[in-house]
Amino acid sequence: IDVAAGTFTDASGYSNAAATQFNWTYDGTSPYVAITATDGSNAVANNSITNDETLSLTFTANESVTGFAIGDIGTFGGSVSSFSGSGSSYTATFTPSGERNTGIYLPTNTYTDIPTNNNLGSIPFYWRYDATAPTIVSGTSLSSDNSTVTVKLSELVYDTNSGSGALEVGDFAFSISGGLGTLASATPTSISKANPSFTDSQVATPDGPQSVRTVDLDLDNDMDFIVPAFDDDIILWYENNGSQSFTQRTVGSGIDGPKETYPVDLDLDGDMDIVSAIYNDKDLLWYENDGSQSFTKRTIDASLAGNGNHCMVVDLDGDNDLDIVVGTLNDNSLSWYENDGSQSFTKNSIGTGFASNLPVVIDLDEDGDLDMVMRTFEGGEKLRWFENNGSESFTQNLIDNSNGGGLKVIDLDEDGDYDVVSADGNNGHVNWFANNGSESFTKNTIDNSGMSNVACIGVGDIDGDGDIDVAAAQASFNGAADDKIVWYANNGSESFTEYTVETGLNYPGQFELLDIDGDKDLDMVSAARQGDEIKFYENVDGGYVLGFSLSATPNGSETLTVNPTSSAIFDVAGNAASTSQSNNTVTLNNQRISMAITAVNGSSSAVSDGSTTNDATLTVTFTSSAATTNFAVGDVTVSGGALSSFSGSGTNYTATFTPTADGATTIDVAAGAFTDASG
């Protein structure tokens, strides 16, 4: 604020001198802090799993702050120490309380900026500490022909400590002891991953479950389920006791047609809240968790223009709070609700004139902002992506004209860009669209066998062989006879083979594919809308099939031992399997061919081994335990007599034995004289 010289006069007419300038800055913007972590040298990503005993935390504020202290930091599953810093940068050490899920968060109103604006909450940092190395578990088995051994590990494993790479033959080593068999090589001759199977169990029977979401709602280190029971007008959650036994609890009731839920810490206070789109009431709600799983209903929008169809939560505008994307039916619009950091929301349009399924929000073009991929329905269904210009203004781009179903976005062919996996309901196809790196897409077929109305798609490494597989649920409206959940095994070159998870469900409209039982492989949980049931499918690992070669034939008393080689097999946290294991031995099958020699006299009476008779000749029978084509009279050694009239094939041969004089005789076949068909 300034007054220039000569702008006014006093009563005598003298002009004023320049005023002393008054300078002032208005700042009504609340500060916030971003939480990041390293293991001391390498960055640790939010929502990751590592084996670090501690994390080095950095708290970076968007401006200088005051009053920020160690007591402002909220945690579960661990504690902070060694806090220091000033201005806009602070550090601390986080130590987990055990091998478990952990979280670090900063609630609102705990510190201020220089003008004394109270802080906003921070996006929590979630991390799992895992120091348990993978082990070989029970179930090691041998093929009948001694050519392969199958070993199962306690968790999903990789060839590198960065959580990537399929296992190789050099990651295992063999040894053998006892018997006559010997190994041609201590290294497996081949390695392949056997397909998993799925064991299903019914979790609950809510009335009209529209979907199921999975989260550790009570922060007790296991996965719980959130279910909107549409026909019962209630939102339920199912508490896991840690052994996949579930107890039903209530989130909220008295709502007309809950269609979708999304669990997230919306108010950034360290516990899990739930956002929900309500179909009949046309409401957008969130349920605030008090930290003890008692929920208070909060209204975001009580007058949606259409029926609430889906919702998801993400920091769409990158301002360190959580916004909400909502799709509605009958008015055909897609909107996002901008959070001001205090859970007060402003509605913004993404697009109108179309209905849509739940969008995938991802930086598809990798330009630093969040785009959307979705199915739109406006007289002709289309697969589109909506490009964000960086200011949350979206431009529609067509991917394909195929009809609707579930979709996922992932780098399926692992070439460094995002592809789209989707279903074409009219043609009964499951497709994937390869991105050329510039968001131009080429359609490829995964399944064209008639999967009608594919309501949900899942993607991930289901069989643990290092590539991305696909799962799909068919919800046909024709009853349980036509409905199913299947998965498609990727051979590593995006050629897929279908396997069945479940048939006989009644409209499995939605499922999730994630680790539910804590063994780091991908299980499933499904919601059957018409069948009124929630089912859990445990992924039962098929194991690794290791080929081996023997240089000498075993007699059945050999012990074959298989162990990981040193620093070769890792879990996702980076723990290496030990070179010394249990449950890692098998006894080889006897592959030596036995030969039984029997005799009868001229009256066809048996002559026993070691007996004395006055028979002038014996008819001798040679019976092999396996068919042979190269057993000949020359393979038989005799003393005290001679063989004649030798004949036979397969496993049975005969000859006539004539002694040369009174006295002892022998008839024998030495080891290694002949072979079976396999050599």
What residue spans do the PLM features occupy?
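Beta-propeller blade termini
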Residues: 210-219, 259-268, 309-316, 357-364, ...
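Short glycine/acidic-enriched loop and turn motifs that connect beta-strands
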Residues: 231-233, 280-282, 330-332, 378-380, ...
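Non-catalytic beta-sheet/beta-sandwich ligand-binding modules that flank or precede catalytic cores
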Residues: 1-195, 541-679
